Structures are given as C-alpha cells and as structure tokens.
Regions:
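Short, glycine/charged-enriched secondary-structure capping and boundary segments
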Residues: 1, 89-93, 133-136
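Helix-rich cap/lid subdomain of alpha/beta-hydrolase
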Residues: 1-39, 45-61, 66
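Residues at helix-coil transition
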Residues: 19-20, 40, 114, 145
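Intrinsically disordered, low-complexity regions enriched for glutamine and histidine
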Residues: 39-43, 124-127
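Conserved serine/cysteine hydrolase catalytic core
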Residues: 40-112
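Catalytic active-site module of serine/aspartate enzymes centered on a nucleophile-bearing elbow/loop
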Residues: 103-147
C-alpha cells in the first residue's frame, strides 16, 4: 500500500536525504521523474508489487551472515554519507538513529567478504554514480582493469 502512495515530492525528499546527503542539483530531477512515472503509470500496481517483494526479501532474508561465503571478486562502492535504511521511515527515533551508517557498514561488509575491495566516496550519499558520475566511472574503470 505504501508504494502505491509514492509521489514525486516524496521521492525527491527521500533521495535528497539519502541519495545525495542533503544536497540537490537540477540534474537529479530526471531520476525522480523516472520513479514517479513508474509509480503513476499504467503498470504502477506491478511496480508497487515488485517493490513490496523486494522489501519483504530485505526484511525476511538477511544475507549479512552469508558475506564470508562469497567467492567472486567483489568491490563495494559506498558513499560515506549514505543513510539509506529500509524501514527507517517507520522505526522509532531510537532505532532510526542506529540505521544507515554506511561509513561504518561499508567497512564491516568489506571485512566480511573475502578479498573485497572497498571504494569510498567521501561525503556522498547512496548514489555516487549519479552524484559524481566522472569520479564514480573513473573508480569503476580502475577497478575493472586487470591487475
């Protein structure tokens, strides 16, 4: 039901807080328009259902304990100001204060994944690929180059 009520205004507010660490640039509007369009277009009920399934998976199937089992090359691209946390909008203030600290979570996840590489984007939120595409692309290309 929550997904059926999404609006462009709500999406922008959420993305500004989490994706862009409180900042906003006009070039981010297209991503809000895309999500708002998906959530208001003719397929909006399917989009909402798929989103609900993703939320259910996140809530009911944590994978943190499985990170040490990864055997593929893994690079984590993390914005240190990311505060994304599923459920933070319905959490109590005390619980919310403990969620979404990616400056810590990124390092913890990288330690748990064998041979993981952590690339941090200082001061950036959940979407460094959109916030600073040149910087992100350079880091990605460097990571993909043969060692």
């Amino acid at each position: 039901q929550r997904e059926l009520k999404l609006s462009a205004e709500g999406i922008k507010k959420y993305e500004q807080q989490t994706y862009y660490a409180g900042n906003w640039k006009p070039e981010y509007d297209k991503w809000v328009d895309m999500l708002a369009g998906l959530n208001s277009g003719p397929g909006h009920k399917k989009v909402a259902w798929n989103s609900a399934l993703i939320y259910d998976m996140i809530y009911s199937q944590p994978v943190y304990y499985e990170l040490p089992d990864l055997r593929v090359p893994t690079t984590l691209f993390i914005g240190t100001a990311d505060t994304t946390a599923i459920g933070s909008d319905i959490a109590s203030p005390a619980v919310k204060a403990q969620l979404g600290h990616y400056e810590v979570l990124g390092k913890e996840a990288a330690k748990r994944i064998p041979h993981a590489r952590l690339v941090e984007f200082d001061g950036m939120g959940h979407a460094p690929q959109m916030e600073a595409p040149e910087k992100f692309n350079q880091a990605l290309i460097e990571d993909l180059e043969p060692k």
